[in-house]
Amino acid sequence: MPTATNGDVDLFYETAGDGPTVAFVTPAGYGAWCWSWLVEELAGPFETLVWDLRGTGRSDAPRGPYDVATLAADLEAVLSDHGARRAHLVGAGLGGMVALAYAQEHSRAATLALLGTTADGSRVDADALAALQAPRDDPEALRSSLQRAFSDGVVDAHPEIVDRIVEWRTEDDADPDGWAAQREATTEFDATDSLYEVTTPTLVVHGRDDAVVPVAAGRDLADDLPRGSFEGIDAGHLVAAEEPAAVGDLLVGQLDEHGDSEY
């Protein structure tokens, strides 16, 4: 299993499929499990790359605080280790912030897809973000915390899928210190004054029922990006897990439109 290194921090990643690289960046606290369904939509014609943020899963967990610039440097280390000259970046929540910062500071981003994210961490509902965390050894608490991640009724309507998510979370989610460090990185981020620098084609996708980042923040992000476009979906904060087929179709459309000229 490949591991990249940024300074003294080891970063776990894995790939599947062939073709142009699509790299996924997770939201605060969650392991790469949250991309499982979207990876299934894309793997094959594309190479998918998922990795564990520092503080999460099989990557090292140095003490915080963390910031988005450091996490973007971690992403650069992963892409460099893998030998990806260019990559399409898909980030959710904190991961979208990391993708934005990466596009400003590094040269490998071909396109961006930002899911349930904002350029201004002060627009994140800090209480709702904190409510997503639960002890990894408490399955019922993990299950309950998912209510804020999805739209109303989804958790109760799909018990088998939720059981699977709970099992993944016990193994891969951040520990309490990692959660705290990643939450702080989320709420402290502010790129509102520099969005004009991000000329990468960017698709902003937002769940209309997002309880963590208001949908208006996603619309504003798309409006403020030079090459931004916005798509709303009837879903909650984890829009890619709740509606992977719809998100996958949007991503394939973006990659078909912008992919060839970047490779």
What residue spans do the PLM features occupy?
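Conserved alpha/beta-hydrolase catalytic His-Asp/Glu region
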Residues: 122-123, 142-194
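Catalytic active-site module of serine/aspartate enzymes centered on a nucleophile-bearing elbow/loop
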Residues: 227-263
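Acidic catalytic loop of the alpha/beta-hydrolase fold
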Residues: 208-213, 238
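Flexible "cap/lid" loop of the alpha/beta hydrolase fold
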Residues: 100-140, 178
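Gly/Ala-rich beta-loop-alpha elbow adjacent to hydrolase catalytic centers
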Residues: 91, 95, 99
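Conserved HGGG/HGGXW glycine-rich cap/lid loop of the alpha/beta-hydrolase fold
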Residues: 5-64
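Short beta-strand/loop motif that positions the catalytic acidic residue
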Residues: 198, 204-206, 210
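Active-site loop/oxyanion-hole signature of alpha/beta-hydrolase fold enzymes
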Residues: 50-90
